[in-house]
Amino acid sequence: MRRLTVRLFTAVLAALALLTMGTPAHATAPASPSVTFTNPLAEKRADPHIFKHTDGYYYFTATVPEYDRIVLRRATTLQGLATAPETTIWTKHASGVMGAHIWAPEIHFIDGKWYVYFAAGSTSDVWAIRMYVLESGAANPLTGSWTEKGQIATPVSSFSLDATTFVVNGVRHLAWAQRNPAEDNNTSLFIAKMANPWTISGTPTEISQPTLSWETVGYKVNEGPAVIQHGGKVFLTYSASATDANYCLGMLSASASADLLNAASWTKSSQPVFKTSEATGQYGPGHNSFTVSEDGKSDILVYHDRNYKDISGDPLNDPNRRTRLQKVYWNADGTPNFGIPVADGVTPVRFSSYNYPDRYIRHWDFRARIEANVTNLADSQFRVVTGLAGSGTISLESANYPGYYLRHKNYEVWVEKNDGSSAFKNDASFSRRAGLADSADGIAFESYNYPGRYLRHYENLLRIQPVSTALDRQDATFYAE
């Protein structure tokens, strides 16, 4: 009897182990739910910088094509900046320094005051570009007065621009781009600690110079540094090459506990992390900044680009760089993934599986499936658009294949080009439902032309099938991220 009891107990343990191994985790709502925007946010606004303040407002400044003034607008939402009234807070000098090429303003709130960092040339030499700072003690920087704090002095007086400031472990730093007379290039990247918001302290360190092929097209440029911190790491993006379709983002990374003034602490990406996309019609994305969503749960990439490739004349004289927004995603290794500059219009989202929370809907050889660690981000991004079949439906358009949609065929789900037929429109349309396994936060997609069949994963492949069991409902529930 004792031997039988032991055998029975062992069998039960084995069965429980098998069940545990075969049962996926049940997800909770994602820590970073979806956010969407409509691009472009602002026409003819380059080098954009958006700062979210504790007063509930976003503050937005950028280079204007006339290069003659600093403008500012604010709104309580990011999308609201598109229509917010714009105020000129400072105008170039009629003569002397700060009299030409007013470029790349950034607004920061430091120790109870507002500061704007910008670059400017002189009326006697428009290319004598240096970095300058404005200060305001007003609660509302759009209506307050501004004081010129003067030039940010550097040990070497040379072409310098694109100052940005950030704090790591309680220490404020300044990063910027500057011509190093000892090098055969246009600008390199430097970093220093700050004694106050308009003065650097100690000896600056050069942390990057343009040496890679994609950094030296047209001009040899590293410029426009911007910093985002995540998971104990500091990521510094920068722009490279000429300001045409070759403009792109590179990235330096360092541990937040490292000595950031030691050039060896920084590792450079071997390839651009964000560049032109012919597929989406976006050219020369760059000179970015970072902000956060209204709920503080998503990091947002702010940048400019053009929607055409060929420029007549000097790109510097082309006024049509536009400010754009899109969400930053994070890879499993903790590095940021910017994907591609998405098409104009509504921005795409990702859909994670309810019961396999690390897996996302993506296409591979145009077959739709769920998969983890999708480093080619755009394969897992879809625009939620008005359904091709109408009648209150939605369709899911591929981010990197505009005009291609998730559609079912023989109950299998593929990403295919819209051929304009009624059959395609019906197959590519879904009714958006509350999640079948999580009605509060989840989403389910019911086939338009096969009511009762839902988009679900089965052996990692997407299909449309009826749902009846608890497992069916889990497989047919997703979260938008």
UniProtKB/Swiss-Prot annotation:
The UniProt pH dependence field says: Optimum pH is 6.0. Stable from pH 5.0 to pH 6.5.
Q: Which UniProt keywords apply?
A: Carbohydrate metabolism, Glycosidase, Hydrolase, Secreted, Signal
Q: In which pathway does it act?
A: Glycan metabolism; L-arabinan degradation
Name a Pfam family for this protein: AbfB
Q: Which residues form a coiled coil?
A: none
Important for catalytic activity, responsible for pKa modulation of the active site Glu and correct orientation of both the proton donor and substrate (site feature) positions:
D162
Biological process, per Gene Ontology: arabinan catabolic process; L-arabinose metabolic process
Q: Which reaction does it catalyse?
A: Hydrolysis of terminal non-reducing alpha-L-arabinofuranoside residues in alpha-L-arabinosides
* Species whose genome carries this gene: Streptomyces avermitilis (strain ATCC 31267 / DSM 46492 / JCM 5070 / NBRC 14893 / NCIMB 12804 / NRRL 8165 / MA-4680)
Report if keyword Signal is assigned.
yes
* Protein's name according to its UniProt entry: Extracellular exo-alpha-(1->5)-L-arabinofuranosidase
Domains as described in the record? Organized into two domains: an N-terminal catalytic domain and a C-terminal arabinose-binding domain (ABD).
Where are the catalytic residues? D47 (proton acceptor), E223 (proton donor)
Q: What InterPro entries does the annotation carry?
A: AbfB_ABD, AbfB_ABD_sf, Glyco_hydro_43, Glyco_hydro_beta-prop_sf
